[in-house]
Amino acid sequence: MELKNQSVAIISSNASRPLAHYHPDVWGDRFLLYKPNPSSEAGQKPVIEELKQQVRSELKEASNDYMRQLKMVDAIQRLGIESLFEEDIDNALKNLSENFDDYCKDKHDLYAIALSFRLLRQHGYRISCDVFDKLKDGEDGFKVPPSDEALAVVELLEATHLRIHGEVVLDRAFVFARIHLESIEANLNNPVAKQVHNALYGYSNRRGMQQVEARKYIPIYEQYASHHQGLLKLATLNFNLQQTMHKRELSELSRWYRDLEVPTMLPFARQRLVETYFWDAGVVFEPENDVARMILVKVQCLISFLDDTFDAYGSFEELQLFTDAINTWDVSCLDQLPDYMKIIYKALLGVFEVIEKLMIKQGTLYRLNYAKEAMKIVVGGYFVEAKWREEKSKPTTQEYMQVATKSAGYMTLIITSFLGMEANIATKEAFDWVLSEPDVMKAAITLARLTNDIVGIELEKERKHIATAVEVYEDEHKLSMQEAMVEIKNQIESGWKTINEAFLRPTKFPTPILYRILNYCRVLEVIYDKSDRYTHVDPALQDIIKQLYIHPIP
């Protein structure tokens, strides 16, 4: 109790700190009070297993019918149940890839070609964009079939999100598809109208979070007269079963978070447990990876506190002390820290003790040092930015990006997300590879930093803060803000192309490693859509979270 009073006194006594005045948690005790119903969950599992066997059998039977198999794979993926059929889908796509040329060589079927391209490309097949050449209509147009016009162009648009560097035909297809869909959207009826709207103004199949996209697509799919009853029922049951898992995990995490007493001990910090869980469950979403997911959420919560400490509260001298404590990594450092920092440091050491026990149990103790090194990377980035702010320095674009891609935290979080993975996938070599910043990693952390900065310009201007990437680039290249913004957005698109290219076979490391990187970028599409929804949790994000974690699908 004495420590709490000291902390409050310290915090309230210093009016000169650059406080950000973040809004409080919007969820209250909603998840803390959750009571599971094990009998209900147990009753759903046999039904799910029966439906899985039915779908598995039908997918195999469809191997002699190209379009039937193609549409089944697409539906499984869009409905968010791809993880239930990984081996079956691998076999189906192998079959589709072997038959693609024969099926499409004499056809000008935009829907079939675009859908085939997307599914094969996103699973690593090096299918050439030349398949679209025969569908071109002039320099920038494409031949659109009168039947299924809207869905064919939707698939073309979705396919363009898999493009890599140098694929001019897909760059042009992206522009064409958007213009075409915008021109016909008002004349469409549901469910096609909803699917077109999502393709235009939502998140693409490639860049969208799997759970968010599945939750949107399930009711759309149900409205199609041709929907597969077994797939629809399986997707609904699986979604609702996973929702109970999310509620259970959020309840456990809420107890841990409550014990930290964040509102009292760290009133300057953002209270964003549920939003952090949404973030990390979008990266590590597999039910079997529950322990790794819980650790990742706790680590990101603590990183968020550190971010706010360096960004919106700590004095430069205090930040120096904390940086030294992180680099030393020893409980003896507590004595040197102000009381509010002790809360964060003790919690961090506690979480890493749990990580150490897990790594010993898994026989992967070497990972602990990588996790610690990742924390030192993000804190080191925070401190350099604090030094720039203290000294009123103006970094060049290159200097800014070298530091800001670290302080964004995504390198640290991606490394942390590897901790619970199988030993033969997240090997020592995989950790070293990611830390070396290969092209795909560099693209991801650059994309993450720039996406964050685009929506954070006005927020950062409100208080003493270093310039964002947009402002640094604008100043260095003597551009207007609009011109700098265009260039930054071009760099983001370039990053997505690099990420897409990394998935083409043969890959440097197993695709589960790459999916951790991709999934973080997918979450950013939602978190930083038009604004910083993590800092200011808007009604749109609240609605997404409610759909995922509160309201089951009827």
From Swiss-Prot:
Of the GO CC terms on this record, one is:
cytosol
Q: Which UniProt keywords apply?
A: Cytoplasm, Lyase, Magnesium, Metal-binding
Q: What does the record's cofactor remark say about binding?
A: Binds 3 Mg(2+) ions per subunit.
Q: Where is the signal peptide?
A: none
Q: Which GO terms describe its molecular function?
A: germacrene-D synthase activity; magnesium ion binding; sesquiterpene synthase activity
Q: What class of enzyme is it?
A: lyase
Motif DDXXD motif in this chain: 307-311
Q: What is its EC number?
A: 4.2.3.75
List the catalysed reactions.
Answer: (2E,6E)-farnesyl diphosphate = (-)-germacrene D + diphosphate
Q: Which cofactor is recorded for it?
A: Mg(2+)
Give the GO terms filed under biological process for this record.
Answer: diterpenoid biosynthetic process; farnesyl diphosphate metabolic process; sesquiterpene biosynthetic process
Cell compartments where the protein resides: Cytoplasm, Cytosol
Query: According to its UniProt record, in which pathway does this protein act?
Result: Secondary metabolite biosynthesis; terpenoid biosynthesis
Which is a Pfam family this sequence falls into? Terpene_synth
Kindly give the InterPro entries that the UniProt entry links to this protein: Isoprenoid_synthase_dom_sf, Terpene_cyclase-like_1_C, Terpene_cyclase_plant_C1, Terpene_synth_N, Terpene_synth_N_sf, Terpene_synthase-like, Terpene_synthase_metal-bd, Terpenoid_cyclase/PrenylTrfase
State where Mg(2+) 1 binds. Answer: 307, 311
- Quick one: which residues bind Mg(2+) 3? 452, 460
* Residues annotated for Mg(2+) 2 binding in this entry: 307, 311
Q: What is known of its domains?
A: The Asp-Asp-Xaa-Xaa-Asp/Glu (DDXXD/E) motif is important for the catalytic activity, presumably through binding to Mg(2+).
Q: What does this protein do?
A: Sesquiterpene synthase involved in germacrene D biosynthesis.
Family to which this protein belongs: Belongs to the terpene synthase family.
Query: What protein name does the entry list?
Result: Germacrene D synthase 2
Q: Which organism is it from?
A: Pogostemon cablin
